Amino acid sequence: KNDQQLRQIQLKPNYLLVDSPGCTYCIRRGLLNLSKKYWKSEYPHDALLWRMGLMSNGVYAYTDDLIRWRNHKKSAFAKESKKLKSVGAKKEWIRISSKFNDESMQKLIKHDIDGDTSYQQKVIDKNSNWLSKRMKFYKTGNLLRGVALLSSINCYPRLRQYLGDWYLICLKK
């Protein structure tokens, strides 16, 4: 909806989903400097900035067409969507996301976010639990572990990724 309004993006349980491509970001220098403490080479830098912004209640969207949609065959999004179609690649994404969630975001809210961070902690804990259960499903292929993931369905970046887990584990082998 392009009504030319500035709206705050709220932190949600599926905060690992990055809603906007990095080429559209406007970033405070302070956040960029702070990100240097938390960035690791395996983390996409735009995802780090998006997630740090969410944790600090500092992500806003201006609803207007500012750039034309660009679809690059070599973009991070295109590479990730092709790359994550195997069990091994998915396990690696879960491992990196777990490390990011449990280390970087945990440190961020403890040391660099002012005020009450109980909601942020709840989101991090919920994602930690979800990623752990998801990894166990991938490692064991146990169907009951897959069903147990329904309790964390709102952590999935997209609902179709839950179905994709089942496809990779049960059908694609």
Predicted regions and their residues:
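Short, structured coil/loop segments at alpha-helix boundaries
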Residues: 3-6, 36, 41-44, 102-128, ...
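Catalytic core of nucleotide-sugar-dependent glycosyltransferases
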Residues: 3-5, 10, 69-73, 78-115
